[in-house]
Amino acid sequence: MKDLIVLTGPTAVGKTSLSIALAKAVGGEIISADSMQVYKYMNIGTAKITEEEKCGIPHFLIDELEPDEEFNVTIFKNKVMGYIKDIKSRGKVPIIVGGTGFYIQSVIYDINFNEYGDDSNVRKKYEAMAETIGKSELHKKLALVDREYADSVSENNVKKVVRALTFFEMTGEKLSEHNKRERERRSPFDFAYFVLTMDRKKLYERIDKRVDLMFDMGLVDEVKALMAKGYDKSLVSMQGIGYKEVIDYLNGRTSLEECIDIIKRDTRHFAKRQLTWFKREKVVTYIDKDEFGTEDKCLKEMLRVYNS
């Protein structure tokens, strides 16, 4: 029996429903590993779990921050380590659920991200560069020093591009090589790490349907409400897929149809990058929804691994 469970997989694969069934089966409590669901007021565009869907299972790192508050991998790791200790102290099983593989890795391998000192000046330099030369050119600069990491991150994810460039300048080491070495570390946990997958074509169809549903549920109004509160595109939270595109639509830069198509395209690309990340992880159990057929059969296999 393991002392920590991780359930991850690409966006829209169906992690939420299975995580609730898993938590009920093992007496678990859920910690979100989603870099967007931590923000308040951002419900539709993040496909945030509802109170009804939680079925009474305690959830952490959902709706904990204002959209203008800072959230990064270091903050995530520190919070999660505290939640794991708290959950275990009550005789429950911590279950980390979400698709942000880098965040998950930081916890299960106890990675120290502050080992090279204060990087604020270097980081600010690259943040300013993103404004002056543009995110595409900044991404090209990253590719020159760390092609592998650049291939794994979108040019739209300026925060990660800046971090990788900052890390390289501060240490002289590629972040991709640093991450590989950290993955070789011995984990402080005896964990079960599940990656939920399905046929790529079916996944992309689910993504397209989810995006259509988001607009039916009122994504445009959600973004309008956020903007009315003073939250704009300069915030990391508002750079999330679905939010920045709707802002462009509201500002007249795209039509609604173009906006929807861009969100679908970028979400599919995001899912592809997630799958690439998970393939790097060594100690994982893949749960193929097509192979197992039903959620009950997926759960049965997960419980077998958890109890082994």
What are these model-predicted stretches?
Residues 1-308:
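Phosphate/pyrophosphate-binding catalytic cores of soluble transferases and nucleic-acid-acting enzymes
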